[in-house]
Design a protein with these regions (language model features):
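Polytopic transmembrane helical bundles with strong interfacial aromatic enrichment
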Residues: 1-163
Length: 163
């Protein structure tokens, strides 16, 4: 059971980080909406699908595998690194919902609307830098989360000599 939980947790973590990278690549390839609105809209729709169908579900399933592992393995109950992973996962979930998935979804909807209403083109691509920074920060937190699971630091304070 323990190996199955670890395997599931590892696979979903790989999927999550992979989807962050895919979204980053899409961001780097976005054309200016005023130059190629159809391409911009298509890419934004693809990004929305990646965020909704891969990024968020993989993170939620990874969280469930991690919680199940914490419940099933008594050694994880008091391990500071395990609690650190839980905290970083909650940060990743909130950051992914608020900083990645929601803005991508809004922009995809706006891009589709701009296809029929040309006046909306000027409202597109206003927050690209914020989305890119969200991807970078969430990617770094996810990397720290993986590092905690791999190296499992003890976080023990050094004993002070008795006087």
């Amino acid at each position: 059971m323990r190996k199955l939980l670890k395997f599931g947790h590892s696979m979903t973590a790989i999927t999550f980080l992979g989807s962050v990278v895919v979204l980053w690549v899409f961001h780097q390839q976005l054309p200016a909406p005023s130059d190629a609105l159809e391409v911009y809209s298509a890419q934004r729709s693809a990004m929305e699908r990646v965020a909704s169908l891969v990024l968020i579900p993989s993170l939620l399933i990874s969280l469930l595998f991690g919680l199940a592992s914490m419940a099933a393995v008594p050694g994880f109950h008091g391990a500071p690194w395990a609690w650190g992973k839980l905290v970083t996962t909650v940060l990743m979930l909130e950051g992914s919902l608020l900083g990645i998935q929601s803005p991508i979804k809004r922009e995809a909807e706006l891009a589709v609307a701009a296809m029929t209403d040309g006046d909306l083109v000027g409202e597109l691509a206003q927050k690209l830098a914020a989305e890119q920074w969200s991807l970078i920060l969430i990617g770094l937190v996810a990397t720290a989360n993986v590092a905690l699971g791999v190296w499992r630091p003890r976080f023990r304070s050094r004993a002070t000599p008795a006087s």
